[in-house]
Amino acid sequence: MRSPPREARLRMAVEAIGKNKNLSIRAAARQYNVPEATIRHRCTGRSARRDLPANSRKLTDLEERTIVQYILELDARAFPPRLRGVEDMANHLLRERDAPPVGKLWAHNFVKRQPQLRTRRTRRYDYQRAKCEDPKVIGEWFTLVQDAKAKYGIVDDDVYNFDETGLMMGIIFAGQAYGRLIDELMRAHINHITKLEFLCAFREAFFASMTEKNIQGGFSGAGIVPFDPERVLSKLDVKLHTPTHPDSRPGTAQPWASKTPYNAQETRSQSDFIKTRISSYQNSSPASVLVAVDQLTKGATAVMHQVALLQSEVSSLRKANEPLSKRRKAKRTRIQLGGPLTVQDAQDPLDQRDVGKGALQETQPDSSGAGGARAKVRRCNSCCKVGESASLAYMRRSLIIYVRSYNDF
C-alpha cells in the first residue's frame, strides 16, 4: 500500500499529538515516519515553506490581485500588455511606497504562477475580418451549409475546400513545412536555391504536411466534418452589451453581506453596514466591526492601486501624443492651389519671408549700441542681396540650374 505524502503525514502527526497528550513528539515522528524537528516546528505554529511567501517578495497579495485584474481588463479591451508592461505596473506600484523595483525575470515568474494569465504570441488582426466574426452571421452560414447538404444529398466524403478562385487542383499551401526545410538549407550555408532544390524541398514538405490526420483536423477544426458549429462559435468573442443596473432589476434587494468592496455601490453598502454595526454596538464584541473596517480599507487600497496604474497609463499616452499635437498645431502654408508648380512660385513665399525678417531687423534699434544704433542689415555672402542668406541663394541657383537642364533635355 502506498504511503500518504509527507505533508499529509505531518498533519496527521500534529493532530495525533493534539488529541493524545501522552504521545510524545519523538514517538509521533517514529510512528508517522517524519522528521522530529519538523513536527516540533509545526506544533509551535510554523507553517510549511511552500505556504509562506518568498523572502524576496516585493508586492503584497492585494497589489498582485490588482495587477491581475488590470491585465484582464486590458485584455477585454483587446490591448493585452507585454511582459515589459507588467513589469512597469509592478515598479509603478512600488514607487508609490518608495520600494526597490522588481528583478528582470519577475514578470515571467509572475505570469507563470498566476492561473488566470498566460503568454501568447500576438499576430496581426485585420479590422474587416474582426467585424465579420459575428456569432450570429457565422451561425447563419453554418445553417446554410447544413441546409444545402440536406437538400442535395451531399455526403461528408464529397466536401471540398473552395475559395474565391474555385477548386484549384494540386495547389495546396504547405508554408510551415517548406519553411523548415529552407531553414535547414540556410543553416548548411546554401543561400541560392535552384529549381531542383525547390522541387525536392516542396515534395518533402507536401508529403510531410498533407497527411490524412492534418486534412481531417482542418475540416474538424472548421466545424464542417463532423458538423459541429460550436467548435467555431465558442472561440468567438462575446458581443458586449450594457448590463442592467442592479437597482432596476425586479425583486427585493438582498441584504448586504460584509465583504471587500470593488465599486462605488459596494463601497456605499459596506459603509452603511459599518454604520449600522456601530450604532447597534452595545457591550458586544467589536470583532465584526473591525473586520468590516478592514475589508473597507482593503477595497479602498485596491482602488488606489488601480488609480495609480491608470495615472501611469494616462501619463504615457500624453507623452506619446505630445509630438502629434505639435504637428497638428504647426502652421501650414499653401504654396499653390492647383496646376504645375514652377520655381518662381515656390521662391516667392521664401523671398517675402526673408525680406520681412530683414525689414524687421532694420526697424528694431540695437539696445547695446550708443544712441540706439540700428541693427546690421542682413546680406548674402555670395550676391550681397539684402534679406537673403547664403543657403537660400544656393537653393535658388540649384533650382534654376535644374530647370534649365530640364528644358534643354
Swiss-Prot record:
Keywords, in A-Z order: DNA-binding, Nucleus
Presence of the UniProt keyword Hydrolase in the record: no
Predominant subcellular localization, coarse grouping: nucleus
GO MF annotations in UniProt: DNA binding
Record field: compositional bias (Polar residues): 255-269
Location(s), subcellular: Nucleus
SUPFAM superfamilies associated with the record: Homeodomain-like (SSF46689)
Gene3D superfamilies: Homeodomain-like
Induction line: Expression is positively regulated by the cluster-specific transcription factor cheR that binds directly to an asymmetric direct repeat present in the promoter.
Residues in HTH CENPB-type domain copies: 51-120
Entry protein name: Chaetoglobosin A biosynthesis cluster protein C
